[in-house]
């Protein structure tokens, strides 16, 4: 029984590593937005929706990893 509990905790810890990738992805998206806006300020209205879409996709990846972690801890 203790081995199964340890495996749950290890699996949950490993699955939360994906949230690190989501954080890095969000940082890259907004760094590119700031870089593009500083190079050409007139493109702000064009670049911003793409940045929000990239943010949403990166955040969804992190939320899926967090959901897997909670499922391993409390659902199985």
From Swiss-Prot:
UniProt keywords, alphabetically: CF(0), Hydrogen ion transport, Ion transport, Lipid-binding, Membrane, Mitochondrion, Transmembrane, Transmembrane helix, Transport
Residues with site note (Reversibly protonated during proton transport): 59
Membrane topology recorded in Swiss-Prot or TrEMBL: Multi-pass membrane protein
Ribonucleoprotein keyword on record: no
Recorded superkingdom: Eukaryota
GO biological process, one term: proton motive force-driven ATP synthesis
Subcellular location: Mitochondrion membrane
Entry's Gene Ontology cellular component terms: mitochondrial membrane; proton-transporting ATP synthase complex; proton-transporting two-sector ATPase complex, proton-transporting domain
GO molecular function: lipid binding; proton transmembrane transporter activity
The keyword Zinc-finger appears for this protein: no
Main location: mitochondrion
Transmembrane segments: 14-34, 48-68
Role this protein plays: Mitochondrial membrane ATP synthase (F(1)F(0) ATP synthase or Complex V) produces ATP from ADP in the presence of a proton gradient across the membrane which is generated by electron transport complexes of the respiratory chain. F-type ATPases consist of two structural domains, F(1) - containing the extramembraneous catalytic core and F(0) - containing the membrane proton channel, linked together by a central stalk and a peripheral stalk. During catalysis, ATP synthesis in the catalytic domain of F(1) is coupled via a rotary mechanism of the central stalk subunits to proton translocation.
Family as reported in the entry's similarity comment: Belongs to the ATPase C chain family.
Quaternary assembly: F-type ATPases have 2 components, CF(1) - the catalytic core - and CF(0) - the membrane proton channel. CF(1) has five subunits: alpha(3), beta(3), gamma(1), delta(1), epsilon(1). CF(0) has three main subunits: a, b and c.
Protein name as catalogued: ATP synthase subunit 9, mitochondrial
Lineage: Eukaryota, Fungi, Dikarya, Ascomycota, Saccharomycotina
